[in-house]
Amino acid sequence: MKLRFLSTLIVLLLGVKAATAQTNMQVFYDFGSDRKFVTMTLEMFKADKWGNTYFFIDHDFNYTDNNGNKDHCAAPGGTYLEIARCFNFWQNTKLAPLSLHAEYNGGITRNYPISSAWLVGVDYFLHDQSFRNTLNLKALYKNIHRTSSKVPMQFTAVWTCKDFLGLKCLTFDGFADFWWENHGCDFQPDGTCKEKRTVFITEPQLWYNVGDLFGCENLNVGTEIELSNNFGSTAGFKCRPCLGVKWVF
């Protein structure tokens, strides 16, 4: 669950005079057949005169003890972090939509670590005249610790559509990632697995600002659908729907 509102907030780069920060928290229940647990995400975006900083932390409440007993309320069973910095020293020029991008990813699940990854590249920002519809496109060199890949690259798209389909308070946003990574999936008891070389994941979200109805614009309710191929330890295509709430601080 990443980059939920980056493409919306990056418009601040075009006119911000002082540092501006936005933070939100999302709580989702994942209905995926191999999930069925709660994930909490904390996000922060801050724009400044040199660009912007973004990070999120996911906590999966899927803890299982050594005897295989599920105790999801005891503690997070997995945690994942992404932190990214866009450098843009030319915000008042025609090159303002183009930024240099640096990023770190890493975490751990209840079964295996998520290897540290370092990414560097470029980010290009597109928008309509109102800035209510935005798109970020990223081309990144990706180095994953102790992992090989045929092409050490990741391509990312991040989008936001405010007042989606002309409906006030409805927002459609999300991201899509594609990268190369040699990794094992569908591990069997005898230790065998399927070898995969690419990964794709997208998480479109639909949010309704229900709080606007009673004077509390912080509160949103909505849905997310994770669509992935060879993501994590699961081979092939997977669809995992979620329902959740978001509070914008």
Predicted regions and their residues:
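Short glycine/proline- and aromatic-enriched beta-strand/turn motifs that initiate or cap beta-hairpins
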Residues: 21-65
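Outer-membrane beta-barrel translocator domains and adjoining extracellular loop/strand segments
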Residues: 66-72, 111-115, 148-150, 184-192, ...
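Residues that define the transmembrane beta-barrel architecture of outer-membrane proteins
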Residues: 36-40, 75-81, 114-120, 149-155, ...
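Sec-dependent N-terminal signal peptides
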Residues: 4-15
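Transmembrane beta-strands of outer-membrane beta-barrel pores
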Residues: 27-33, 59-63, 102-110, 126, ...
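Residues on the lipid-exposed face of transmembrane beta-strands in outer-membrane beta-barrel proteins
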Residues: 42-46, 83-87, 120-126, 139, ...
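Outer-membrane beta-barrel transmembrane domain signature
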Residues: 142-220, 227-230, 247-249
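Short loop/turn motifs that connect adjacent beta-strands in outer-membrane beta-barrel proteins
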Residues: 19-22, 50-54, 88-99, 126-135, ...
